[in-house]
From Swiss-Prot:
GO terms for cellular component: cytoplasm. Residues 347-372, 379-396 have a biased composition (Polar residues). Residues 12-27 have a biased composition (Basic and acidic residues). Keywords: Cytoplasm. Its main location: cytoplasm. It holds the Pfam family 120_Rick_ant. This is Antigenic heat-stable 120 kDa protein. It comes from the Bacteria. Residues 1-34, 347-396 are annotated as: Disordered.
């Protein structure tokens, strides 16, 4: 608490005045005799008519409040004690800033002090800003400054008490308190305080507590036994009489006696006249730092002054009530948490503790016998028996020291001294860490501490761990991380309060000069891990926001700040949080880092990549959900499903993501479709639609290489699906069909092979899928070749007036050669007519087109199948002839008509793996072989079998007994044939030919509709 340093006067001291004041202080300290009032309790009262009106300033904010007044006593305390102490403190802070490594921060704080001095000489804003606490605490560590502050306090109170004493003639001035013992109890005393008019203002009650000794630790680690202290029931509200009142109660030594008269220490309560004339508690003056011998409301206050321990006549609970009343009477809203913050600040030393000396004597105490003013403690004459649940035997470091729970019953400083003593003695880092964990557990399990005090104590423990010189760097990391783990596992601390502890711990770590950046990063990462493990998103967000702000405001170099933010982002990125929450947290870290200019371009790019990946994962998840909704919609048929999934595919391709991310999403789409429970043909149609959508997508928004990349991902999704291999083969085929129907180039088709190669399946499955892909490509190329041939059909180049583009092209050629023809005619050389020239040139063009088409198709095959899986046209022709011969030979092995008919259906009609041309050529050859040899040998004789089948010949029954056997008008040689079987086979062959010729190769296998 800095209340004793708050600006409470507007007076600016000149150098001469400062020297005079210092001289007065030295004189006061050198006095061998002093008035009796200095070492006694005293009070001063004034009536309303006597109080002087001076500007009053808030004890908390330091702002002048014109509506309130302050009497001369309060003003004197401010001017002779508080302001000189603040001046010396600022002087030390400026010295510390001059030596600070972070020159930017040092200059910023120096300017802050200088600029505020011009507006407010008391620097109320600076001292009231929690961000400046570390500079104040560091200055207070200076031994010379502490001596100065103590001397100012002693001399100042002497001056005030002497100046405003009744003995010096000051009306209503300070006078000793006349305590009167209660007859019924010698440890109870009381006194009535009256104003100068004789009206009672209040009755003060004093209770002396005599107890068996308990131990308090000093800053140097030595311990002092307290056997007696007192409590005074300071009034909170006064409503009896008018006037002002100042109660100045001397602090007692450790044995309960008053201090020597040359070093009195006072706790003063200032009650000033309020608007209704009644005294109001406006201010409390006490030495700094004020501590409490326990965590409950009944814990007694004590201070260390001049190397000695003094107890003050106020408990923690009473002090809380008094501070809340001060807030009320200063016109501020009452907030319990704010009041407790102030109390905790005064109750705990922020100064770096020293190691407790090893020669410390055994100090164990037992609970006081009166009202239990302090927590239960062990009697002096009994050995310490720590609870095993709090401190296992293996963790005991010094039997002459208190355990953590007992040490904490005194004060946080006692606990730190105990821990430091153990860390000094114990060289095993594991046992050192166990001791730190034990202390953290004791702090959080202390039922008498409120959450604010627990926060402050945990932070103090972390700071102590970081700064302890007996811990190796790795042990410091492990120690702080152990504290963070204790925070994580504590079941009683609310998540938002845990978040504050984590943030404060990171601030201590990052601003420490005793750690390397690597060690700081390890502790920061642990804090982030703990923060991300909190159970609600608000606490997680608060932790990350707080930590990133701490990083940016730390005294680290800019480069190190960027590294720390990257570490925060990495932890968020690898966490198990939802993608939506990751997006929010990582986005906020990136945004803050860019705004604060602590992230390098490379770091920004790296974090943006992580953010893009998370965004892609979320997009992928959302997309697949939509796809599943479509697939399992019972009201939509396959055609509608295909249309809707094509629309989703198109949206993905148009999205802002990279081609790689788009490929990942498309892969998930095809994988989801392939793995669905739909019929194989239904899945095939949907996949075909996806392939066609990719192939036909605008080249301006999606380049050809990116299309190929995405198409490979589409096939990979199919290949890696859990459906059976035949279904995957079918979907691979129709994916290729979709590419061709979408006019996709060979690069897109070739990408299908790449997708198969990159898939995580076994080699045999890869080979099967490649064959399916090549078969689809073969069929597509055959269609293209056939379409090219069909385009030439009907172009009778012998006609005098050819039509279509070929004729027009030939006409262009003739127009070009006409001048040559005319020149030849003039030379009277024989020439051909124009029409003949057209025919010749057209024939030449068609020959060239045919050659180019063959060459183009062969090149295309080579490109699509670099491994030679697709054959050239010449190779395909040879293969077709060979296959036809094999089929004809196989047919000849079938002896019965039924076997031959079955062969025709199975091998020529149903087997679609054979090309259309091979099957038709086989049928033609089989039909030729059905003709009789005599007819074949005599080409001039028309065989009747053709006319019979075509219906041009009239057949008559051979006999009345067999009317179904008709007489065939045909020449029969010496080897007679089975006329009836022959006719059936020829009919079956011609029927098969009709079926094959009617096949529509431009459409895939018909799909089942729902």
């Amino acid at each position: 608490d800095t209340s004793e340093f708050d600006p409470l006067a507007n007076k600016e001291y000149t150098e001469e005045q400062k020297q005079t004041l210092e001289q007065e202080q030295k004189e006061f300290l050198s006095q061998t005799t002093t008035p009796a009032l200095e070492a006694d309790d005293g009070f001063i009262v004034t009536s309303a008519s006597f109080a002087q009106s001076t500007p009053s300033m808030s004890v908390l904010s330091g702002n002048i409040s014109p509506s309130q007044t302050s009497d001369p006593i309060t003003k004197a305390v401010r001017e002779t004690i508080i302001q000189p102490q603040k001046d010396n403190l600022i002087e030390q802070i400026l010295k510390d800033l001059a030596a600070l490594t972070d020159r930017d921060l040092a200059e910023q704080k120096r300017k802050e002090i200088e600029e505020e001095k011009e507006k407010d000489k008391t620097l109320s804003t600076f001292f009231g800003n929690p961000a400046n606490r570390e500079f104040i605490d560091k200055a207070l560590e200076n031994p010379e400054l502490k001596k100065k502050l103590e001397s100012i306090e002693i001399a100042g109170y002497k001056n005030v008490h002497n100046t405003f004493s009744a003995a010096s003639g000051y009306p209503g001035g300070f006078k000793p308190v006349q305590w009167e013992n209660h007859v019924s109890a010698s440890d109870l005393r009381a006194t009535v305080v009256k104003n100068d008019a004789g009206d009672e203002l209040c009755t003060l009650n004093e209770t002396t507590v005599k107890t068996k000794p308990f131990t308090l630790a000093k800053q140097d680690g030595t311990q002092v036994q307290i056997s007696s202290y007192r409590e005074i029931d300071f009034p909170i509200k006064l409503d009896k009489a008018d006037g002002s009142m100042h109660l100045s109660m001397v602090a007692l030594k450790a044995d309960g006696t008053k201090p020597s008269k040359d070093k009195p220490v006072y706790f003063t309560a200032h009650y000033e006249e309020g608007p209704n004339g009644k005294p109001q508690l406006k201010e409390i003056s006490s030495p700094k730092p004020l501590k409490f011998a326990g965590t409950g409301d009944d814990a007694i206050a004590y201070i260390e002054h001049g190397g000695e321990i003094y107890t003050l006549a106020v408990t923690r609970g009473k002090y809380k009530d008094m501070m809340k009343e001060v807030e009320l009477n200063q016109g501020q809203s009452v907030d319990l948490s704010q009041a407790e913050d102030i109390i905790i600040g005064q109750g705990q030393s922020k100064e770096q503790p020293l190691i407790t000396p090893q020669q410390t004597t055994s100090s164990s105490v037992e609970p006081p016998q009166h009202k239990q003013q302090v927590p239960p403690i062990t009697p002096t004459n009994q050995p310490l028996q720590p609870e095993t649940s709090q401190m296992p035997q293996s963790q005991q470091v010094n039997p002459n020291l208190l355990n953590t729970a007992t040490a904490l019953s005194g004060s946080m400083q006692d606990l730190l001294n105990y821990v430091n003593a153990g860390l000094t003695k114990e060289i095993d880092s594991n046992k050192q860490i166990d001791l730190i964990k034990e202390a953290a557990t004791a702090i959080l399990n202390n039922e008498k501490s409120d959450i604010v005090e627990k926060q402050a104590n945990i932070i103090a423990l972390a700071e102590n761990t970081v700064n302890n010189k007996n811990l190796k760097p790795d042990a410091k990391v492990a120690g702080v991380n152990a504290v963070l783990e204790i925070i994580k596992n504590d079941q009683n601390t609310p998540n938002l309060e845990k978040s504050k502890m984590l943030e404060a711990t990171v601030a201590i770590v990052l601003n420490s000069e005793n750690l390397e950046p690597k060690q700081k990063q390890q502790m920061l990462e642990k804090a982030v891990d703990v923060g991300l493990s909190l159970k609600d998103d608000a606490s997680r967000a608060a932790t990350i926001d707080g930590i990133k702000d701490v990083v940016i405001k730390s005294n680290l170099y800019t480069e190190d700040k960027g590294t720390m933010l990257i570490a925060v982002g990495d932890k968020v990125n690898v966490s198990e949080l939802s993608n939506a929450e990751k997006q929010k947290l990582l986005g906020s870290v990136l945004k803050k880092g860019v705004e604060a200019q602590v992230l390098s371009p490379a770091q920004q790019q790296l974090m943006q990549q992580h953010l893009d990946k998370i965004t892609a994962e979320q997009t992928k998840k959302d997309t697949i959900k939509k796809v599943n909704d479509i697939l399992f919609d019972p009201l939509s048929n396959t055609e509608l499903k295909t249309t809707n999934i094509q629309a989703i595919t198109s949206n993905v391709l148009d999205g802002p993501a990279t081609a790689e991310v788009k490929g990942e999403i498309i892969q998930e789409i095809t994988n989801t479709v392939a793995g669905s429970s739909l019929e194989a043909q239904d899945k095939a149609e949907i996949v075909k639609g996806v392939g066609e959508t990719i192939a036909t997508h605008s080249d301006t928004s999606l380049s050809l290489p990116n299309k190929a990349l995405i198409m490979a991902s589409a096939e990979k999704g199919i290949a890696e699906s859990k459906t059976n291999l035949p279904d995957r083969e079918l979907m691979t085929k129709v994916l290729v069909d979709g590419i061709y129907e979408g006019k996709g180039g060979p690069e897109i088709t070739k990408a299908v092979s790449s997708g198969i190669d990159n898939s995580n399946i076994n080699d045999s499955e890869k080979e099967a899928l490649k064959k399916a892909k090549d078969a689809a490509s073969e069929a597509a190329l055959d269609r293209d070749t056939q379409n090219l041939t069909e385009g030439f059909k009907g172009q009778n180049i012998e006609e005098h007036k050819p039509h279509d583009d070929i004729y027009n092209k030939a006409r262009e050629v003739i127009n070009a050669v006409n001048p040559v023809i005319e020149a030849l005619e003039k030379s009277k050389e024989p020439v051909v007519s124009a029409e003949e020239r057209i025919v010749q040139e057209t024939s030449s063009i068609l020959n060239n087109i045919s050659k180019l088409a063959v060459e183009k198709v062969n090149n295309l095959r080579s490109m699509l199948s670099p491994n030679g899986n697709l054959k050239t046209l010449e190779e395909k022709k040879e293969e077709s002839i060979k296959k036809v011969d094999e089929l004809v030979k196989a047919f000849g092995t079938k002896s019965s008509t039924e076997e031959q008919q079955s062969f025709i259906k199975t091998n020529l009609i149903d087997d679609k793996t054979l090309s259309k041309e091979v099957r038709l050529q086989t049928i033609d050859k089989l039909l030729q072989e059905q003709k009789r040899a005599e007819a074949i040998e005599n080409p001039s004789f028309k065989t009747e079998d053709v006319r019979v089948v075509s219906g041009k010949s009239k057949l008559k029954p051979i006999s009345k007994d067999n009317p179904d056997i008709e007489k065939a008008k045909m020449v029969v040689g010496r080897d007679r044939v089975n006329i009836k079987g022959n006719i059936k086979i020829m009919g079956a062959l011609m029927n098969a030919r009709d079926i094959i010729q009617s096949e529509n190769l431009n459409k895939s296998t018909p799909i089942k509709r729902e």
